[in-house]
Amino acid sequence: MKKTVVASTLAVGLGVTGFAAGNSADASEQGVDKAQLAQQAQSNPESLNAAPVQDGAYDINFNYNNTDYSFQSDGQYWTWSYGQGSTNAPAQETAEQPQLVEQPQQTEQASTEQPAQEAAPQTEETQQPQQEATTQTTSSSNESTSNESSSSEASEGSSVNVNSHLQAIAQRESGGDLKAVNPSSGAAGKYQFLQSTWDSVAPSEYQGVSPTEAPEAVQDAAAVKLYNTAGASQWVTA
């Protein structure tokens, strides 16, 4: 960190021309109290801004506690600075230092203000996916409801909702005939249940009797139960 204070707007120009190399002197050569000047620069800079450290022209440079200090005057205008660096740095470089220090500060201010200008678009970008997500969710929900309505319908004479795949199986197996019986396999009913399969899914009061003796709602419920637990593979040609 390098801190430079110019006590007058003309001091920079004077620092370039008036404090040329060759006039520099160490503090000890001029009988200056290094500790006192260092403390003033660190804790009481107002006093250094208000008045020069001594009368007349001077060019004082010294290092105290690993920090470089520089105090200069042409007898009318004065400057002072401190920071890490070379104690032998030409006075011309010290005088130009305020311009180098101030320029990054202007850049930092511009960089700091920029995010505030971008804040509004960021909010819009954040909200937009939420709106799209809501629309997609609603659309998906509507499609799901529509699919369920078209694929799960109650059979005629039955209040049980049977999905479209199971309805197709019933049409293929028996043509929807509740009393259909396959003489070769013994499969019976709307869904052509084998007796052992029927007994595993039918209500207790219909177990042990032919599926053809059960009403359509009971046959539908048994078929849905078998389809949901064992899958369509229970019907060989499903």
UniProtKB/Swiss-Prot annotation:
Biased composition (Low complexity): 102-156
Protein's cellular compartments: Secreted
A Pfam cross-reference name: Transglycosylas
Presence of keyword Heme: no
TM regions (residue ranges): none
CDD domains: RPF
Comp. bias regions, Polar residues: 87-97
GO MF annotation: an example: hydrolase activity, acting on glycosyl bonds
Described purpose of this protein according to its UniProt entry: Is able to cleave peptidoglycan and affects clumping and separation of bacterial cells.
Family the entry assigns: Belongs to the transglycosylase family. SceD subfamily.
Protein name: Probable transglycosylase SceD 1
